[in-house]
Amino acid sequence: MALYYDLPVYKDVYALIRELFVCTSNFSQAYKYSLGQDIKRDGLNLVRSIYRANKHKDKLPHLEAFLDDFELLKLELRLCSDLKLISTRKHAELSVLLSSIGKQVTAWRNAQVV
């Protein structure tokens, strides 16, 4: 079992969280303590799920939890883009990272099902 912080998906999720904290710090007060807090919390939940999936023998429940939180985070970021809280360019940059993370976790989950 690899250490969770050596996993490529962990490194990508960590990079995403750093970006999320930077992006949400620029939100207006109306959104910073509602949508911004939810985004940061959901990002941190992703790291917890990676840690737990790597730690436990039965990885599937943790990977499924990750994918659930991941979909919510994608929705929140799309809402931010629609509300002009983040630029279209920043949303595109985050989408590339999200796509990479999604592919890695989906492949990991599919490997557990077989």
Enumerate the language-model features and the residues they cover:
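Amphipathic alpha-helical assembly/interaction segments
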Residues: 1-114
